[in-house]
């Protein structure tokens, strides 16, 4: 950073505990766990560990077009939802950002794992030619920062940090 202040003006959360900030905070304070038996995998019984923190009850169409939501990995959809919640929490207009003063920073170790799993299955069943050319773009973590940036009047400053 160059010594300038950063201001966080709004918060958004997509979590196994809750997908609304006030419910999430109440859950944290009360010690609620978001860990439970995995419901999103048909073959979960094959695995020795069958618990995880899954996102449930998120109406993604509140935050992005349903057609677009089907194209992107849940990692991206969840990030867009959380960013939208943060903008709303801040009381900001989606299209009123000063491109010179606003930016996006995403920190994540890895991105689109569900997309990777889907493409791995396609490769095993049909060979490498069945793998989507979107595999790498959907997996890399900076897809989310870029997607959010484009969604909000093409913010110039967008980064991804491990």
Please place each PLM-identified region on the residue numbering.
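Solvent-exposed alpha-helices and their adjacent loops that cap or buttress functional pockets
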Residues: 1-2, 95-99, 128-129, 141, ...
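Glycine-rich phosphate-binding segment of PLP-dependent enzymes
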Residues: 30-32, 56-61, 115-130, 149
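Conserved small/polar residues in nucleotide/adenosyl-binding loops
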Residues: 153-162
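Active-site pocket-shaping loop/turn-to-helix segments
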Residues: 13-22, 66-84, 131-140, 156
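Acidic-glycine-rich active-site phosphate/pyrophosphate-binding loop
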Residues: 51-58, 118, 139-152
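ACP-dependent fatty acid/polyketide chain-elongation machinery
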Residues: 1-68
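Hydrophobic alpha-helical hairpins/lids featuring a short glycine-rich hinge
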Residues: 85-130
């Amino acid at each position: 950073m160059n010594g300038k202040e950063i201001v966080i003006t709004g918060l958004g959360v997509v979590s196994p505990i809750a997908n609304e900030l006030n419910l999430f905070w109440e859950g944290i304070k009360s010690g609620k766990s978001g860990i439970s038996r995995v419901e999103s995998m048909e073959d979960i019984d094959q695995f020795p560990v069958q618990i995880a923190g899954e996102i449930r009850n998120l109406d993604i169409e509140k935050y992005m077009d349903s057609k677009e939501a089907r194209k992107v990995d849940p990692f991206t959809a969840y990030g867009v939802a959380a960013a939208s919640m943060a903008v709303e929490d801040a009381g900001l207009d989606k299209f009123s950002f000063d491109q010179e003063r606003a930016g996006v920073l995403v920190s994540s170790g890895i991105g689109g794992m569900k997309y990777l799993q889907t493409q791995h299955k396609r490769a095993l069943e049909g060979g490498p030619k069945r793998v989507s050319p979107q595999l790498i773009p959907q997996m890399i973590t900076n897809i989310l920062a870029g997607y959010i940036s484009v969604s909000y009047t093409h913010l110039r400053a967008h980064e991804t940090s491990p």
